[in-house]
């Protein structure tokens, strides 16, 4: 039985003055307690989660970068920043989980309130600012959870720049985080696309980005898959330039996309509980308003690289159809966060069941055969 939709979702969508960050922090805290506990009750609860939310079919399995993804649906970065619930994500049906964003220096993030739900648009608005306990703290957490290095699903780690580090020191800042964590993650993501760290998006310019990627690859002696997460607000020419740079630097893939700063996508004039005009609010939008543009970027990346650069698609996935559209546009894997919060934990299982139905309808043998099948030029 799923308790989320009848009990927790109404609270999320209500007009009560409930801080979304408080809800998220407490939900994550419960999962972290469950992950740490060795009690029989915790074991029974985890077994219940696996039975309720788990779903696997070999036709959905994907192999990338020497890793096996039993299911193509992963948890996007931003929810479990410090990895405190890392062992639990497989219990909830995810095929992989991306932790972070973490930075070299611990930082509190931006002032509260900094996370808002906008139910009428099925959206979230955040200006969290990479609040995290530091890359070294995440390393300690992962060593504690996985002392032998064995994880039930691939774990990705999303790396950002510390707010106190000037843009001129970005290279050493990213390298410092990577050094702390490089043996503890299955893949790594360079995040230069959050709108909530001053100047960060300027690092998406090829001339700024290339030294960062080159330094990380030089440090990448264990040959961990290194990916880049990009913004949906780039113009197509910038997306193409980044795709070529990614290939030149032999990146493992691209994650498309991060949040958007295009406030015209929202129907509201003010954020919940705020009087300031929306146009003056700093932050990024995730959820349904991002769906179309993120899929467009995926399609453009797939065409530009002729399908040679794996893509993880994220942005506005609330259903199997949303995930399918990103896959046929060129995504090999997909991630959820905002849609997962709105729809509940069963979303992951529902997506997988729906993907199988679409494979059958299309007469395709497996999900790999669907990747990019609708990305051809019209």
Swiss-Prot record:
Gene3D superfamilies: Aldolase class I (3.20.20.70). FMN binds at residues 77-81, 101, 158, 191, 229, 257, 287, 316, 337-338. It is found in: Cell membrane. SUPFAM superfamilies: FMN-linked oxidoreductases. It holds the Pfam family DHO_dh. It is a peripheral membrane protein. Its cofactor is FMN. Its EC number is 1.3.5.2. Its main location: membrane. It catalyses: (S)-dihydroorotate + a quinone = orotate + a quinol. GO terms for cellular component: cytoplasm; plasma membrane. GO terms for biological process: 'de novo' pyrimidine nucleobase biosynthetic process; 'de novo' UMP biosynthetic process. The active site is at residue 194. Keywords: Cell membrane, Flavoprotein, FMN, Membrane, Oxidoreductase, Pyrimidine biosynthesis. GO terms for molecular function: dihydroorotate dehydrogenase (quinone) activity. Pathway: Pyrimidine metabolism; UMP biosynthesis via de novo pathway; orotate from (S)-dihydroorotate (quinone route): step 1/1. Binds 1 FMN per subunit. The keyword Cell membrane applies. Monomer. NCBIfam families: PRK05286.2-4 (NF003651), PRK05286.2-5 (NF003652), pyrD_sub2 (TIGR01036). Belongs to the dihydroorotate dehydrogenase family. Type 2 subfamily. This is Dihydroorotate dehydrogenase (quinone). The gene is pyrD.
């Amino acid at each position: 039985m799923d308790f989320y939709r009848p009990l927790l979702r109404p609270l999320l969508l209500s007009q009560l003055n409930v801080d979304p960050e408080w809800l998220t922090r407490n939900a994550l805290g419960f999962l972290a307690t469950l992950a740490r506990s060795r009690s029989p009750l915790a074991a029974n609860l985890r077994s219940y989660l696996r039975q309720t939310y788990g779903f696997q079919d070999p036709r959905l399995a994907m192999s990338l970068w020497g890793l096996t993804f039993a299911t193509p649906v992963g948890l996007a970065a931003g929810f479990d920043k410090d990895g405190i619930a890392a062992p639990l994500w497989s219990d909830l049906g995810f095929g992989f989980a991306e932790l972070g964003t973490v930075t070299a220096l611990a930082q509190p993030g931006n002032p509260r309130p900094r996370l808002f739900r906008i139910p009428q648009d099925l959206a979230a608005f955040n200006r969290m600012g990479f609040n995290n306990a530091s890359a070294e703290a995440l390393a300690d957490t992962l060593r504690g959870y996985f002392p032998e290095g064995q994880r039930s699903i691939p774990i990705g780690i999303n790396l950002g720049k510390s707010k106190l580090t000037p843009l001129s020191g970005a290279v050493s800042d990213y390298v410092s985080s990577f050094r702390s964590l490089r043996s503890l993650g299955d893949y790594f993501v360079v995040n230069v696309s959050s709108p909530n760290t001053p100047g960060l998006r300027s690092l998406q310019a090829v001339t700024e980005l290339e030294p960062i990627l080159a330094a990380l690859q030089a440090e990448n002696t264990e040959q961990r898959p290194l990916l880049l997460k990009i913004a949906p607000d780039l113009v197509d020419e910038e997306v193409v330039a980044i795709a070529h740079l990614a290939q030149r630097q032999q990146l493992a893939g691209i994650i498309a996309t991060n949040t958007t700063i295009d406030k015209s996508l929202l129907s509201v004039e003010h954020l919940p509980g705020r009087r300031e005009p929306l146009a003056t609010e700093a932050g990024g939008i995730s959820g349904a308003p991002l769906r179309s543009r993120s899929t467009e970027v995926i399609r453009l990346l797939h065409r530009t690289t002729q399908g040679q650069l794996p893509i993880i698609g994220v942005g506005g996935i609330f259903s199997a159809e949303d995930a399918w559209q990103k896959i046929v546009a060129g995504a090999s894997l997909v991630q959820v966060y905002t849609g997962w919060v709105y729809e509940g934990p069963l979303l992951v299982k529902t997506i997988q069941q729906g993907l199988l139905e679409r494979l059958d309808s299309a007469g395709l043998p497996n999900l790999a055969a669907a990747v990019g099948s609708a990305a051809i030029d019209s």
